[in-house]
């Protein structure tokens, strides 16, 4: 990097700073990503008890007040890795300072769709690039599948349709184009009280049948995808680290016929996602369009909101049905 831009991470929790034990070639955190990519990590901002230890680990200053940090550090790039409930207000404060060249936000972008729309509009008005960290956008194996036509896809997830579910929705938009329709089938509350995990059926431009299969985060953590095309199949599992590819063979199997046969098993490159993100930020500062923009985040959150509302409406209908049956 020819220019060591000043960077700051707001949020010293797991994805902000804590998951990495220190400097790594394959960082998991925003702090680790900035250091690995050669940026000048100036500060961490948080109100938690672990702030001082995390800041010391990265050789950065510790701030408990965002406004003070902005005045003293004048960061050029900021990562917001705090909960969605407080993220939008801090991101708007950042726009009051002309030092900011780009911002990275964790997902979901905001606590509500209206808040996200207002936030993106504010960044657009100030002409400050906004990158949303839907991490699969920065994984080589997924990037290699962009534009593919598929017959069907199944993605298994848990921990909320707006939180982890939007990872799946954004992935489908990246691979298959815009969503044409969506319908909630069932759901459960497995982690967030205000964000159910919804099982849903969706249709996209290049994949007419997508099943989001909602699991239960209280049982285990899982996110995997199974995509089937006219002459191929791709399975990504093992925390997104493994990709298995199958291709069409004639006269294969018993009895002989047209079958999908495993061709390869490889690492997806997911371990480089954070570092790729940080390298992408520099390109965005130089004029490149973000791989995942605020508009992309809004599109996924819109779909997730419709699915959440659809599920909640179905639950209300069921409750009223039970009530009327009981009083007949």
Predicted region positions:
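N-terminal Rossmann-like dinucleotide-binding module
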Residues: 1-57
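Predominantly a Rossmann-like dinucleotide-binding segment in NAD(P)-dependent oxidoreductases
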Residues: 10-13, 129-192, 314
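Rossmann-like NAD(P)-binding element
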Residues: 69-89
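Contiguous beta-strand/loop segments that form the cofactor/metal-binding neighborhood of enzyme cores
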Residues: 166-248, 267-289, 304-308, 322-328
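Short acidic-hydrophobic, aromatic-tinged amphipathic segments that line or gate anion-handling sites
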Residues: 61-66
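Beta-strand-loop-alpha-helix segment that lines the small-molecule cofactor/substrate pocket
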Residues: 76-77, 88-134
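C-terminal helix-rich "cap/oligomerization" subdomain common to oxidoreductases
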Residues: 1-5, 53, 77-82, 280-328
């Amino acid at each position: 990097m020819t220019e060591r831009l000043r960077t700051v991470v707001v949020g010293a929790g797991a994805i902000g700073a804590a998951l990495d034990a220190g400097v790594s070639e394959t960082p998991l955190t925003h702090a680790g990503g900035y250091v690995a990519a050669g940026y000048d990590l100036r500060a961490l901002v948080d109100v938690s008890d672990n702030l001082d230890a995390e800041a010391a680990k990265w050789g950065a200053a510790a701030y408990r007040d965002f406004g003070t940090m902005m005045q003293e550090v004048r960061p050029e790039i900021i990562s917001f890795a705090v909960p969605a409930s407080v993220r939008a207000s801090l991101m708007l404060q950042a726009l009051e300072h002309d030092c900011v060249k780009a911002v990275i936000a964790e997902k979901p972008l905001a606590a509500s769709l209206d808040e996200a729309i207002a936030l993106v509009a504010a960044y657009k008005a100030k002409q400050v690039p906004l990158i949303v960290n839907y991490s699969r956008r920065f994984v080589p194996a997924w990037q290699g599948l962009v534009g593919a036509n598929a017959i069907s896809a199944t993605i298994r997830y848990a921990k909320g349709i707006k939180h982890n579910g939007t990872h799946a929705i954004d992935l489908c938009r990246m691979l298959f184009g815009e969503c044409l329709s969506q319908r909630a089938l069932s759901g459960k509350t497995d982690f967030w009280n205000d964000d159910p995990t919804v099982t849903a059926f969706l249709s996209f431009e290049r994949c007419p049948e997508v099943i989001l299969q909602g699991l239960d985060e209280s049982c285990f953590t899982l996110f995997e995808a199974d995509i089937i095309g006219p002459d191929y199949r791709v399975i990504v599992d093992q925390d997104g680290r493994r990709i298995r590819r199958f291709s069409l063979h004639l006269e294969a199997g018993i009895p002989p016929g047209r079958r999908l046969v495993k061709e390869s098993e490889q690492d997806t490159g997911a371990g480089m996602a954070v570092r790729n993100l940080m390298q992408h930020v520099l390109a965005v500062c130089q004029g490149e369009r973000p791989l995942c923009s605020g508009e992309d985040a809004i599109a996924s959150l819109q779909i997730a909101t419709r699915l959440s509302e659809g599920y909640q409406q179905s639950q209300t209908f069921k409750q009223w049905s039970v009530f009327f049956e009981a009083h007949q």
